[in-house]
Amino acid sequence: MQWEIVALNNPTFDTPAILKKLADVLDREKRSKGAARRKSETGFGGGSARKSFGSNSVSTPPMMNTRTIKRMAGHSRRVDEFSSSAQAKASATKRAKIGGASGIRFDFTTPTKSGALAVSSPIAATTSPICTTGAYKERKDMGKIEIDHNSALEACKPQEKPVEIEILSKVDDSRYMYSTIEQRAEELENQMCEMRQLFKQKHGWEEDDFSPVGFLSAEPVLVCGRICCEAPNGKLNAKSLLLEGSRIHSNGARVKMEVESTLPVYSLFPGQIVVAKGRCPSGHTLHVTELYSEIPPESPKVDNQEKQSLSMMCAVGPFSTQEDLEYEPLEDLLGVVNETQPDVLLLMGPFVHDKHPQIASCLPTKLIEDTPVALTFQDVFTFLLTRIAASVENLKTRVVLCPSTEDIMHHHISFPQPAFHVNMDQLELKDRQQMTFISNPGIISINGISIGVTTQDTLLHLAQEDVVKLDKNKPKKMRIARLAEHMVTQRSFYPLFPPSQEAMLDFTKRRAFVMPVQPDLLFMSSKLKHFVNDIADKTLCINPGKLTRGKNGGVFAKIYVVPQNVDDKGLQDEEELKKKHSILPRTKVQVIRI
């Protein structure tokens, strides 16, 4: 049945319509087989009467089973709402098929738009989507400190006045995923030319010092290009490394790179722009002897930064467990906010997760006075924002919200994303500046401290593609820190190309995820384990972890930037001054279980 395969692979099909169609097809098959059986019994065509097959010999079609209905009802996801009803209807269908029933009928009642759900609705039939089974409430190690970075430092007190938040970079609204191959190729070319110019400025090279990629030479030459894989859809390794030149300087030529036997250490990934020095006697293989890949941006200049302090809390969605949409973990987090009253609360999406069982099945509900009420996606999002606004209304805490590509309520599904469009009148805040909506990615400045934020899982995608050779004689750097460092040294919140399918990247908006300045703090969301690491000499990279993990609680982060009193009158060296004013030695980070 070809339509079944189409249905399984098309999440937009309506579930009741699918099951009704399935019932009709099975009914037609039953009638067809019944006619064939009568034909064989009467010996149609002049032959003798044949033995009649018993009803038990008619088997259920291979596609029609409980697992199939579960997949069709949940669009290949585990949706609790349909599990009980699907199993019951699967058993009824099988009995009807074996017993020779005259027909199959399914009864699916559409839930009401508002008010209490009908008793006959799939949600009312089971309590699992709207009642907590206790997995979150029975969690252990509440308040346990998982990471204590710079534990010797004391937590600083919140400031007496609300802090000022300045947005340093943002993403404008535009038509996303509306581009041609020529436009994407042009952006790739522009990126390579810009990075080439930055390499020249940093190392003092001239244009005459460079040669085209693939230039035949027995002497060492300098070439600039992008790392790519020899196989179009293959995984990068030391044997499949290619260097692709720009169209304007190398006519887009590619040359194989030999690094395994010539370089003691390297860390490469597809899309990385590098300058390589080596010999290319055949014109087909470049024997690399030197590799330049780091070109971090400058830090923003701020006066009197040593006098500034900052207390923050940061949490990454989902903010509700998969059992319900009650947002209990968020309520617990807001309780901690009321106790500690930090200067800033940074919340990173998803806020209404598109993979939540109730959201994926388009049946969001909430308990209101012990009664399940059907909600729209907008209802859930508005309730969430209203609850956050109400919890900080009487505090000096500023709230910063960054969206995610997994947010069902965001109007922009590709990366990079502009900020949420929110009607502030609905939140009824006395001070509208108390909530700030930033883009994904975004860079903000608070008390002279620059903060980069992204919910794109760049770390996971880099971890799946990088090729590395480490120096055994040097201290081993954490892999996570090395991957995060690529973002800063390549000046991009997403330096990988071609991107992962999960990234939903719109490369024509490349300039929107370029890192214009090197942030002091870099917050990123990743499925990888939470961590805190110094990267690129100036940046503290923080993955706070998820606030929830399935049905269980997760972690959040507390950040304290302690003011530094340094007598720098005797310091004449600029680099020494930068080290003294760095926030790395005066930042305390705690990752705590909710």
Question: Would you name each region that the model predicts?
Answer:
Residues 1-594:
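Extended recognition/assembly regions associated with phosphoester-bond processing machinery
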